[in-house]
Amino acid sequence: LCALGTTIKQSGSRAAFREVDYTFVVNAATLAKNAGCPNFVLNSSLGADAGSGNFYLKVKGELESALQGLGFASLTLVRPSLLDGGPRPERRFGEEIGLWFGTRLRGLIPARYRPVSTKAVAQAMLEAALASKPGVHVIESESLTQSIGKA
């Protein structure tokens, strides 16, 4: 199970962000694979796409591609929208605005873009790891939002 990630602001640069969100994760996955781990579950991001013009989504997409290349018997990519896990020690103004609108306008926002409980993401990751279904599986944000209030 991997939920490692940072922000460009926290890491200080795009290069440092890429080191944490791509290099560290690929290195950890490679070590796990070489040690005989048959499955890997990643908390990625809605919109992850190696061809994206958005740096964050591009790195997430490149990471997903790299993990697929490692040949895990079971690989699950969880792609939540904006994460709602309660207050953070640091201020993330854009995230706070997104959560404020997302929770108040929930019924007007397509399920794909609604904020997702960190508990729902953790539950989906745990279930995927325990099921260990062969192949590559993607759990999109809209299926995670259906479990809000249940997790």
Predicted regions and their residues:
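Structured catalytic cores of enzymes that bind and process phosphorylated ligands/cofactors
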Residues: 2, 27-30, 39-40, 85, ...
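A generic short-segment signal for beta-strand/edge and adjacent turn/coil regions
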Residues: 9, 44-47, 106-108
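Active-site "substrate specificity/gating" loop of NAD(P)-dependent dehydrogenases
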Residues: 12, 43, 51-52
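A short helix->loop->beta-strand "cap" motif at the edges of active sites that frequently abuts
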Residues: 35-38, 71-73
